[in-house]
Structures are given as C-alpha cells and as structure tokens.
Regions:
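Positively charged n-region of N-terminal signal peptides that target proteins for export
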Residues: 1-4
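Bacterial N-terminal signal peptides
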Residues: 7-16
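Edge beta-strand at a domain terminus
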Residues: 72-75, 118-145
Length: 145
C-alpha cells in the first residue's frame, strides 16, 4: 500500500510540474475513441459531467467494459477554478487481478492523451507496465468552435 501511495504522489508531482496548457473542464466531458482499430489498449473512453469515467479496452471478440468509476480533477494550483483550468483527471480501476491508474489530459477541444499504469496484484509475477495513447472525440460529439 505504501508503494502505491508513493507512486500516486509521484504522478501528482509529475502532473503539477509538467508544461501543459490549461483547459476548460468541458473539454474533458464526452465520448472519445481510438482512431487506430488495431490498438491493443483503450478503444473508447467516456467522461461524464458528474466526474465519472467509463473505459473500454481491447479484447476479443468484443471490447472489455471496465465500467464506471469516479475521477479526481487536478488544477494548476490549490486555488484554481477546476471548471476553467482543469489540467488532468485520474481514476483507479481494481478488477481483482490488478490495480490500474488512468490519467487523462486534454490536448485540445477534441483530443485527449490517456496514460494507463497497471500493476498486477494476483502474484502472477507479470511486470507492471504503462502505455500512452491519444483519443479523439467522436465526430458526432465534437465541440463546435
């Protein structure tokens, strides 16, 4: 547990000191998809206005539904208005065999970067891993400039 806490603290510090433009929280709400049909990662991600995330991962024959979990939103400082200056949201998935941290960063009105960190908890000796990908807002859900 201490190790997980240290990892989370490291990720938060990394996010705070990274050079990222601020975004309206509205940019983080919506349905996003992976443009590459051959992805081995996340295929779809939905962020709701009530601070929930729903993720689907690549599986065969149909995508794996990770379900809805709450997100935490991060701003540039302790007094930031998160509606106007959201920098990241994060969520934790715990399906029983692993603990997965999902970190979402808005890139622009219709594009997000997703980083996924997975640590296996089932004593399988599988190596913890991470991947990063860019998802685009579904065209029928795109924000109008």
């Amino acid at each position: 547990m201490r190790r997980i806490t240290l990892i989370l603290m490291f990720l938060v510090v990394l996010m705070v000191f990274s050079a990222t433009a601020y975004a309206q929280k509205e940019w983080l709400v919506g349905d996003f998809i992976e443009a590459n049909a051959n992805t081995r990662g996340i295929t779809r991600l939905t962020l709701s206005a009530d601070d929930q995330i729903h993720v689907w991962g690549k599986c065969h024959p149909s995508d794996c539904d990770w379900g809805w979990v709450p997100v935490d939103t991060y701003g540039p400082d302790v007094s930031a208005d998160l509606q106007a200056a959201a920098k990241y949201v994060s969520a934790i998935y715990q399906p029983g065999f692993a603990r997965t941290f999902v970190i979402v960063k808005p890139l622009d009105e219709n594009k997000i970067q997703v980083e996924v960190f997975t640590k296996f908890t089932d004593h399988s000796r599988r190596t913890p891993y991470m991947f990063r990908q860019i998802l685009i807002r579904r065209e029928d859900m795109a924000l109008k400039p």
